[in-house]
C-alpha cells in the first residue's frame, strides 16, 4: 500500500468542491444538518463530490497538537488485535480517551478510538501509516477532531 503524505494548502487554492466538502463536514459535525443529503444541498455540492473528497480533505486543526481525534478501524477478529493496536497508538504518544468495539461478526470487528494528540511524538500521517501496516487492520480513517 502506498504511504500517504499530507500537505498544508491555503484554502484559496483548493478547488471549490474540496472547500464545499469541508463545509459539509462542518455542518454535520456541528449538527447544523441532519444528513449528508441535507448538508450538501445547503452548500450546493453533489453527493458524489462529497464522497469523493470526504476522506481526503481535512481542516488544519485536525493535524494540530492538543486536539482530540476520533479514529475508526475495521479489524480482523483475532486474539490480541486490540492490544497491539493500542500499543502502537500509545507508542506514538497519544492518550486513549475512549474505546468502543462492536461485537465481532463474520470474523470482523469495528473499533472507534478517541485519542488526545497533546503528547504525540510524531505527526498524524506517520501514525496513520503505521496503523494501516498492521496486518489485522483492514481499514483506518479519521472520523473527526475537536478541541
From Swiss-Prot:
Annotated ranges, domain ACT: 70-145
Top-level taxon of origin: Bacteria
Disulphide connectivity of cysteines: none
Record InterPro entries: ACT-like_dom_sf (IPR045865), ACT_dom (IPR002912), UPF0735_ACT_dom-cont (IPR008310)
Spans traversing the lipid bilayer: none
Matching Pfam families: ACT
Gene3D superfamilies per the UniProt record, alphabetical: 3.30.70.260
Protein family according to the UniProt entry: Belongs to the UPF0735 family.
Name assigned to this protein: UPF0735 ACT domain-containing protein BLi02918/BL01157
Amino acid at each position: 500500500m502506498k504511504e500517504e503524505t499530507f500537505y498544508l494548502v491555503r484554502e484559496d487554492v483548493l478547488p471549490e468542491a474540496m472547500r464545499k466538502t469541508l463545509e459539509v463536514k462542518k455542518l454535520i459535525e456541528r449538527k447544523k444538518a441532519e444528513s449528508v443529503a441535507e448538508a450538501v444541498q445547503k452548500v450546493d455540492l453533489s453527493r458524489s463530490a462529497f464522497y469523493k473528497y470526504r476522506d481526503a480533505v481535512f481542516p488544519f486543526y485536525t493535524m494540530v497538537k492538543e486536539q482530540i481525534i476520533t479514529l475508526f478501524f475495521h479489524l480482523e477478529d483475532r486474539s490480541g488485535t486490540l492490544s497491539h493496536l493500542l500499543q502502537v497508538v500509545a507508542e506514538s504518544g497519544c492518550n486513549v480517551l475512549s474505546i468502543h468495539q462492536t461485537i465481532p461478526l463474520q470474523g470482523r470487528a469495528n473499533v472507534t478510538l478517541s485519542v488526545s494528540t497533546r503528547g504525540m511524538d510524531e505527526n498524524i500521517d506517520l501514525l496513520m501509516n503505521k496503523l494501516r501496516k498492521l496486518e489485522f487492520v483492514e481499514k483506518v480513517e479519521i472520523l473527526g477532531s475537536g478541541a
